[in-house]
From Swiss-Prot:
Residues 126-440 form the Peptidase S8 domain. It is a single-pass membrane protein. It comes from Homo sapiens (Human). This is Proprotein convertase subtilisin/kexin type 4. Proprotein convertase involved in the processing of hormone and other protein precursors at sites comprised of pairs of basic amino acid residues. In males, important for ADAM2 processing as well as other acrosomal proteins with roles in fertilization and critical for normal fertilization events such as sperm capacitation, acrosome reaction and binding of sperm to zona pellucida. Also plays a role in female fertility, involved in the regulation of trophoblast migration and placental development, may be through the proteolytical processing and activation of proteins such as IGF2. It comes from the Eukaryota. Keywords: Cleavage on pair of basic residues, Cytoplasmic vesicle, Glycoprotein, Hydrolase, Membrane, Protease, Serine protease, Signal, Transmembrane, Transmembrane helix, Zymogen. Its main location: membrane. Its EC number is 3.4.21.-. It is an enzyme of class 3 (hydrolase). Residues 449-581 form the P/Homo B domain. GO terms for biological process: acrosome reaction; binding of sperm to zona pellucida; fertilization; peptide hormone processing; protein processing; reproductive process; sperm capacitation. The proPCSK4 form interacts with HSPA5; the interaction takes place at the endoplasmic reticulum.
Length: 755
């Protein structure tokens, strides 16, 4: 006799319930355990609580807070631990008109946040994490706060990822992965005798190698989801780069890239039109408008005296450029010095230096990963920890945090200088060694940055001979009095068109009104080009938080052959920053989850301790960009007095950056390139997000309910996974890329920034 269909379904459900959650990628869910105590809020204080306790058999254990509104009750007739609440006492309390709120208490799982050292056999070799090096990257300090990258998705754009690797498989995320070399969903690397396609797997392990599994080492964000994009193992075009950088922008939080143009000391090259558009769309629309985080290795051309300001990827304002240092704090032989580098993590130098431990091809491990290729993924993992601590950080917030969490420490260089706001900065190291503990601490208390402003100053538009040494000075108001006026700088660009008889002999510098001198490009002896720079954009981060008003000085100096000649045709100074004085901002706490005093069954906050706004699981001092604060009335049940109104953060309309309400006419500021209509209160411009509803990646594999996730996943397989589960590449861009793919493009060869 065949079992009835219902019985089959029940067996299936039971079987799924017995499957180990880790085996199918689900987070374990613990049922609440109810205890024999209650918290109650009454309107008439201790006298009413005593009457209530006598009537229903409770013991009054006294007030919870000194003001006498909340009380702790216990009932001796209720079992100490139960999987179900006591419905009888619940009904008694609910019917009592003097009880404003009550909650039967449940056991809370808490652990002491001492430093838990991973048991992975090669963790002892991870000197940059295990406190063997001093200073290390303070990874243990971040872990001791309970942070591990949970809920954060990182994708490594490289030559593929060994998705079945013993140290990666459990964290592998297929939605954050794709093969753009062969156009299929499988990013598995192509195996060769020389193991040339090991790069992506090595970088992925640095970010999210599993912890405590008895294998290899551990990743910085060992509970983050990790994906890989195979895009370097074949002919690379502008289309492939743009598609890789646009993969799942509402699902992937961080893209890590350790590649770029050739580090040969003579190349000046950068992203094409489509890739620049992908960067722009990523920071304006990615992560729900908070902005995708692009982490980039600064380059390995030090042996050829290369300069990463001649690399248009690492000197983009949209990427966070990471340099390298050795265990001893020395400049590695391959390191490039340039003004666009923001921060530094560890790698190695000479062959005898300890290197980086990570995953390797053929399910192996290696302790010989090096180059800036090794530094950028370490930074990506640390940034994943910061994003877990505060998921509402924008892409610019994160760059501000990295500036503040990077310190000179023991890093050795002759060019350390103090900029106009008192920070030390170097062309080799940016603002110094990134400290994960300081990064997450600062992230928790960070006040959202005001909208980005851009002020363009056309300084030179007529041909000017370049003498052996010339200075071009311009008194800049930083657009004072206009809607785009800037008080505190972030990125500064100098866009130059010039000719020169031997390009590599020309040193270009920029000095701010506050006296900070930044070398935009130093001499490059191997660059013998006579082409000069055609509309090339140099970028410096050395003026961060300075006031831009005053005289800016561009210096051009011949450092080589005496008879070199050239002409400067155009020079535009591009200032990016904010209207806020960042040096004067308060240091009070902004984000905290411990301030939540009441949660629902799903962990969402229902009440905060003190004047704060509720946003999901957090209590905020004020709402981040894309949200507005308001009060929401709470309907009281029959016989209950009205509960106080909740202070909450609600979503702005998609077209707004900041707002005073949820309507498209409630905007108070706009995303970059959009214009605010002051009278209408609306944003108009090309970057206004499309209002069409989109399927989100979160709707499938990371659904809050595992059963729902499985149903949606089965439907996705049946009906076409990418369509249902949120292959959320922006549709206009996807159509644009599809058309561009049919257009022949000149093949380009990019080299990984390490081995």
């Amino acid at each position: 006799m065949r079992p009835a269909p219902i019985a089959l379904w029940l067996r299936l459900v039971l079987a799924l319930a017995l499957v180990r959650p880790r085996a199918v990628g689900w987070a374990p869910v613990r049922a609440p355990i109810y205890v024999s105590s209650w918290a109650v809020q009454v309107s008439q204080g201790n006298r009413e609580v005593e009457r209530l306790a006598r009537k229903f058999g409770f013991v009054n254990l006294g007030p919870i807070f000194p003001d006498g509104q909340y009380f702790h009750l216990r009932h001796r007739g209720v079992v100490q631990q139960s999987l179900t609440p006591h419905w009888g006492h619940r009904l008694h309390l609910k019917k009592n008109p003097k009880v404003q709120w009550f909650q039967q208490q449940t056991l809370q799982r808490r652990v002491k946040r001492s430093v838990v050292v991973p048991t992975d056999p090669w963790f002892s070799k991870q000197w940059y994490m295990n406190s063997e090096a001093q200073p290390d990257l303070s990874i243990l300090q971040a872990w001791s706060q309970g942070l591990s990258g949970q809920g954060i998705v990182v994708s490594v754009l490289d030559d593929g990822i060994e998705k079945d690797h013993p140290d990666l498989w459990a964290n592998y995320d297929p939605l954050a992965s794709y093969d753009f070399n062969d156009y299929d969903p499988d990013p598995q690397p192509r195996y060769t005798p020389s193991k040339e396609n090991r790069h992506g797997t090595r970088c992925a392990g640095e970010v999210a190698a599993m912890a405590n599994n008895g294998f290899c080492g551990v990743g910085v964000a060992f509970n983050a989801r990790i994906g890989g994009v195979r895009m370097l193992d074949g002919t690379i075009t502008d289309v492939i780069e743009a598609q890789s950088l646009s993969l799942q922008p509402q699902h992937i939080h961080i893209y890590s890239a350790s590649w770029g143009p050739e580090d040969d000391g003579r190349t000046v090259d950068g992203p094409g039109i489509l890739t620049r558009e992908a960067f722009r769309r990523g920071v304006t629309k990615g992560r729900g408008g908070l902005g995708t985080l692009f982490i980039w290795a600064s380059g390995n051309g030090g042996l050829h005296y290369d300069n990463c300001n001649c690399d248009g990827y690492t000197n983009s304002i949209h990427t966070l450029s990471v340099g390298s240092t050795t265990q001893q704090g020395r400049v590695p032989w391959y390191s490039e010095a340039c003004a666009s580098t923001l921060t530094t993590t560890y790698s190695s130098g000479v062959a005898t230096d300890p290197q980086i431990v990570t995953t390797d091809l053929h399910h192996g491990c290696t302790d010989q990963h090096t180059g800036t290729s090794a530094s950028a993924p370490l930074a990506a993992g640390m940034i994943a920890l910061a994003l877990e601590a505060n998921p509402f950080l924008t892409w610019r917030d994160m760059q501000h945090l990295v500036v503040r969490a990077s310190k000179p420490a023991h890093l050795q260089a002759e060019d350390w200088r103090t900029n106009g706001v008192g920070r030390q900065v170097s062309h080799h190291y940016g603002y110094g060694l990134l400290d994960a503990g300081l990064l997450v601490d600062t992230a928790r208390t960070w006040l959202p940055t005001q909208p980005q402003r851009k002020c363009a100053v056309r300084v030179q538009s007529r041909p000017t001979p370049i003498l052996p040494l010339i200075y071009i000075r311009e008194n800049v108001s930083a657009c004072a009095g206009l809607h785009n006026s800037i008080r505190s700088l972030e990125h500064v660009q100098a866009q130059l068109t010039l000719s020169y008889s031997r390009r590599g002999d020309l040193e270009i510098s920029l000095t701010s009104p506050m006296g900070t001198r930044s070398t935009l490009v130093a001499i490059r002896p191997l660059d013998v080009s006579t082409e000069g720079y055609n509309n090339w954009v140099f970028m410096s981060t050395h003026f961060w938080d300075e006031n831009p008003q005053g005289v800016w000085t561009l210096g051009l100096e011949n450092k080589g052959y005496y008879f070199n000649t050239g002409t400067l045709y155009r020079y535009t100074l591009l200032l990016y920053g904010t209207a806020e004085d960042m040096t004067a901002r308060p240091t009070g706490p902004q984000v905290t989850s411990s301030a939540c005093v009441q949660r629902d069954t799903e962990g969402l906050c229902q009440a905060c301790d003190g004047p704060a706004y509720i946003l999901g699981q957090l209590c905020l001092a004020y709402c981040p960009p894309r949200f507005f604060n308001h009060t929401r009335l709470v309907t009281a049940g029959p016989g209950h007095t009205a509960a106080p109104a909740l202070r909450v953060c609600s979503s702005c309309h998609a077209s707004c950056y900041t707002c005073r309400g949820g309507s498209p006419r409630d905007c108070t500021s706009c995303p970059p390139s959009s214009t605010l209509d002051q009278q209408q209160g609306s944003c108009m411009g090309p970057t206004t997000p499309d209002s069409r509803p989109r399927l989100r990646a979160a709707a499938c594999p990371h659904h809050r309910c595992p059963a729902s996730a499985m149903v949606l996943s089965l439907l996705a397989v049946t009906l076409g996974g990418p369509v249902l589960c949120g292959m959320s590449m922006d549709l206009p861009l996807y159509a644009w890329l599809s058309r561009a793919r049919a257009t022949p493009t000149k093949p380009q060869v990019w080299l990984p920034a390490g081995t």
